[in-house]
């Protein structure tokens, strides 16, 4: 149903009953006089009488949907957040804590209102605070590859273009994600099965606007239409929410793409994009930008952070680490646009109990649910099975929309099936699947992906016999999950049972006296493993298993030091603290045997000599007697770092450079010591956070010759700022909250690159030399570059020339800028720096955008025998900017690029 509107006044649809009132904090008071609405004749799907009928049907559907909806309120949970001015329905299930507001309605409430969802119960996906907008102040800019760039006010948008009104179902790509998270945690939060809603949207055609602005031809590069919202978000170091669609979609009249300014007969609510948002029927919600400010026609797809790092379905073997390392986010074939086929059982609801008695067994029980598909494809069939897919029952469909004039369907439909109660009593599971007109259907089993998106496997409801009342039996129904952090669901039970079974399995410790040793596995004592602590033979112990990592020394991303620092020891805790699931799987390739565990921990075969550990022998000498023995004083070390050991360092000062950047100064164990960190290498900070060891690598910004202390410049990643990382940075937040005077363990040195002075490097132990250095950094990756530059500039006899290109999201994100600019002025013949930011303020004198070949050719030295490139930054920057552009410049990337 694509009904057009011919109202001569901009008002709510006649006859629509609203029992809630929009919050006037985002509207003028009194309500403004809106311009008249023109008729979109091109959108007509039938004659005038049919159009009037369609408009009448829409009004009736909205009226029905808005029945029995309580008023929205200022929710106490929003107090103290940037959204404390927005009224919201208190029944909405919050999925990401207090803020940002991401929510879905309880599934029974969603279905109670039928085809049209009341605005207060429409699911919400916000990445940050809701912008405070005013109709009169708002403009939408259309720019890029158009012949007539234009900035439209809201009144002009409504006045100059014909408006149309149509129902559209919106679905979050994460709908049903919690089912995926029960199998394996994705990087997304727990959407249930109510991340779907349907509204009647009124707006102006995007196609008409682009025509008015005279969009360029395809041959001139006008291939993509980018949308940018107004909210300020943390993603990528600070950005707007932006994404894009192909020109063909934007200009296709059958697609019904509109810029919407009304929802269910009212101006948009703040959470849904007031005053204007994009609606792309049949697409995922993530493409429908809210609080729309800019439309940019471009040759390439949108380069925004959220366009690449959100709304992708990557192959199941790709985890977050691999996606970053290998640039999976940027592969176009994994982007999500159109919705896939899906269906859900809504009746019976979760934990519903159906009593089994003479009355209930005399009539059938009606199963109900919803289904939808994408791209305008009609749902043609929904089927239910009670026997695991052996047989299927075809359901009745209730499709309350008419297709548009091109035969497209944009809304969900409802399905129902009557079944005998005794048949339900005999089944263990009810499952549903849907089909669309392209014969797409749902897979039987869940297919995991790292973002947990587009989950559309069979929706299964489990049944169990219960006793609701004395002398009576019944059937209790369980849905797979409950949304957010709510407990419940058969998948949660099964996961808990699996963990319990694993925990209850007997754990057999290998003992020298055990008759059950595995004779097929080599056994090693701790003393034997300790001997393998050199580059010629580097063994480690993790969870009682012995690994020979010698052949991996040259391949370790962090350099051989990362392994050698733990060689010959049990490093279980440290390994767990810093390695991903992928690394843990790789470790199995290097397993050579098992550790022999005994009742004591001494290397000796006699327990009488054991002074520490788990010994139960009562005759051991107390430790205190040994520690009071007269021992010669140990010689004082000139450097603090001891390989393979942690040293305690005291936090003596913390200085705030900006709202999220700190300088931390740590005192060394002795005031006359140097840290002992070679230039180019880094250290680990070690702390117990939330009961677990946390280790993070940092490069000090203080000089290597400083005595008694070292300094770190650290960007603090706060909890609740980035929706994809709601917990923030564990170590950076720990440092920020650490009381002055507290001790922190430090371990090092680590790294495969060492600058030995005057153009000389040791890389994996091999000598390299350069007179000119091309230095590329992104974000916090500036610190190792800074460390090398600092060492060079401190030596007046070091004539190495440095050319730095430093990329950030915004100018405010640039770390150590004052120091870098000072060096560039003081040592203009030896040190040059050029900044690149994605978005810039007026008057910015450096590059805007990304690190391109042009930027690198202009500001870095040419390739040659006397040039080396140094880089440290996010993996996509290294893979897609640094590597290919250096190759184009003639650098031998394999040999002449040193990546920290």
Swiss-Prot record:
Record: residues binding Mo-molybdopterin: 172
Cofactors: FAD; heme; Mo-molybdopterin
SUPFAM superfamilies for this protein: Cytochrome b5-like heme/steroid binding domain, E set domains, Ferredoxin reductase-like, C-terminal NADP-linked domain, Oxidoreductase molybdopterin-binding domain, Riboflavin synthase domain-like
Record bears the keyword Disulfide bond: yes
Sorted UniProt keywords: Disulfide bond, FAD, Flavoprotein, Heme, Iron, Metal-binding, Molybdenum, NAD, Nitrate assimilation, Oxidoreductase
EC number: 1.7.1.1
Cofactor binding comment, as recorded: Binds 1 FAD. Binds 1 heme group. The heme group is called cytochrome b-557.
Binding residues for heme: 556, 579
Domain FAD-binding FR-type: from-to ranges: 644-756
GO biological process, one term: sulfur compound metabolic process
Listed GO MF terms: FAD binding; heme binding; molybdenum ion binding; molybdopterin cofactor binding; nitrate reductase (NADH) activity; nitrate reductase (NADPH) activity; sulfite oxidase activity
Recorded catalytic activity of this chain's protein: nitrite + NAD(+) + H2O = nitrate + NADH + H(+)
Residue ranges of every copy of the Cytochrome b5 heme-binding domain listed in the record: 521-596
Pfam family, one: NAD_binding_1
CDD domains on file: cyt_b5_reduct_like (cd06183), eukary_NR_Moco (cd02112)
Residues holding FAD: 696-699, 713-718, 725, 730-732, 783
Job of this protein: Nitrate reductase is a key enzyme involved in the first step of nitrate assimilation in plants, fungi and bacteria.
Membership in a protein family: Belongs to the nitrate reductase family.
Record's subunit section: Homodimer.
Name of the molecule in the record: Nitrate reductase [NADH]
Organism classification: Eukaryota, Viridiplantae, Streptophyta, Embryophyta, Tracheophyta
